Amino acid sequence: MIIESIKLVNFRSHDEFLLHCKKKTSLIVGENGSGKTSVLEAIYEALRGKSFRATDEEILRRGSEFYRVELKFINGLSTVVLFDGQKKQFLVEDKRTARLPKKYRYPVVLFLPDDLHLVATSPIKRRAYFDRVIAEFDEAYSSSLAKYEKTLKQRNDLLKKYAKNNDRCSGVDLNGDGINNYRRVDVGASDFFSWNILLAKYGLEIRDKRQKYLDKLNTVFNQVYYSIAENNDQVFLKLDLFGGEISEAEYFNRLESEFSRDVILGHTGFGIHRDDFVFLFNEKEADGTASRGELRSMILAMKFIEADLIFQETGKKPVVLLDDVFSELDNTRQKCLVRNFKDNQVIITSVEEV
């Protein structure tokens, strides 16, 4: 799917904007704050069905009653996104829908400057990033993740209800000092049985798919990193398993055994929602050991591999959106970046011509 043009009306700072795209690489040049990233955001929304950073109300240009995004493709098809201030609709092949149908969603590889902070950011943001990446080409992963998150929320809501409706629980030595300050209340543990089964099931499905993705990435990570950085540093991405490697039965038993503690805390303390993705640089954690340039090369290498894996899994060559990616890259590495994405349509933003 090749984009021919993108037109925006009342989208963020743009009252009207029109970009005619090239089949391979298009460059959007402008000062910081001129709305370049908003163009990538609009393209992403038309291809994926939602923004990567904001709600529709935040996207709507101040003082406007609606926003509109129109993406045209060289095959004659188009996708229109229309938000009237209250609800969003998609217009595809003369059909209006509240959500972009799956068959019209197209894979995207997205680079944002904030991605450089992946190494040092919080585990929750790293999980969110990789969950989005894996879901780009694995619908089963997306489904398991949605079910896990729904079940986790239901379990946490129930924990809070028990904590509110019953005396404070104890009998659990949270501080490791051997002191229990409150009367123990064993209440409702059986009500959590089904939630625990589902969390163990979906949790290990997610963990397995996360590990398989990293296995594929790590197979070529060093090779692709070398093509950018041109040095022999060793890079690796590891899945740090919260609670270690366990079976589904062990996962379930852990949830059962920590029921009283979870009631006190008001949330589920154990699970794959506590796993982390750790970047290694020469067998040490990259945070604090790799330079900013080395981190940028690691992230870009991941993007190249992501695009290739999406193509392998879906047969579709993703559209590549790169925001301010040339910053801090010399001419040689800029050319290398474009060369690595030679088989994809690439749209790049920059503060200057390159």
Q: Where are the predicted features?
A:
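Conserved helicase ATPase motor motifs in RecA-like P-loop NTPase domains
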Residues: 348-350
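A conserved P-loop NTPase coupling/switch region
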Residues: 101-105, 112-178, 182-201
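Hydrophobic "anchor" residues on beta-strands that sit immediately upstream
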Residues: 27, 89, 108, 319-320
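Nucleotide-state sensing region of NTPase/ATPase domains
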Residues: 45-125, 129-141, 218, 222-226, ...
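Conserved NTPase motor "head" modules and their coupling/switch loops across ABC/AAA+ ATPases, GTPases
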Residues: 1-31, 168-319, 328, 332, ...
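Conserved lysine of the Walker
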Residues: 36
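Walker B catalytic acidic pair
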Residues: 323-325
